[in-house]
Amino acid sequence: MLILTRRIGETLMVGDEVTVTVLGVKGNQVRIGVNAPKDIAVHREEIYQRIQREKQNQEEQDN
């Protein structure tokens, strides 16, 4: 795992097309902005996990 330190307004690059910018810090919450091409899905981890479970459930029902 790469660990980086960024300040508000600073950005990091993921590959050539995805940027992650620190928008704000309030208490233990960090607001980030993600710019990515439309063909790259960006989700919070809990949403991604739910999508994966739903896909798995659908595949099981199809079999």
From Swiss-Prot:
Cellular localisation: Cytoplasm
BP GO terms, sorted: mRNA catabolic process; negative regulation of translational initiation; positive regulation of translational initiation; regulation of carbohydrate metabolic process
PANTHER family, alphabetized: CARBON STORAGE REGULATOR
Cross-referenced Gene3D superfamilies: Translational regulator CsrA
Upper classification of the organism: Bacteria, Pseudomonadati, Pseudomonadota, Gammaproteobacteria, Cellvibrionales
Protein family according to the UniProt entry: Belongs to the CsrA/RsmA family.
UniProt keyword terms in alphabetical order: Activator, Cytoplasm, Repressor, RNA-binding, Translation regulation
Keyword field contains Cell division: no
Subunit organization: Homodimer; the beta-strands of each monomer intercalate to form a hydrophobic core, while the alpha-helices form wings that extend away from the core.
Pfam family, one: CsrA
Major localization class: cytoplasm
Gene Ontology cellular-component terms listed: cytosol
Protein's name according to its UniProt entry: Translational regulator CsrA
Gene this chain is encoded by: csrA
Biological role: A key translational regulator that binds mRNA to regulate translation initiation and/or mRNA stability. Mediates global changes in gene expression, shifting from rapid growth to stress survival by linking envelope stress, the stringent response and the catabolite repression systems. Usually binds in the 5'-UTR; binding at or near the Shine-Dalgarno sequence prevents ribosome-binding, repressing translation, binding elsewhere in the 5'-UTR can activate translation and/or stabilize the mRNA. Its function is antagonized by small RNA(s).
A GO MF term: mRNA 5'-UTR binding
Originating species: Cellvibrio japonicus (strain Ueda107)
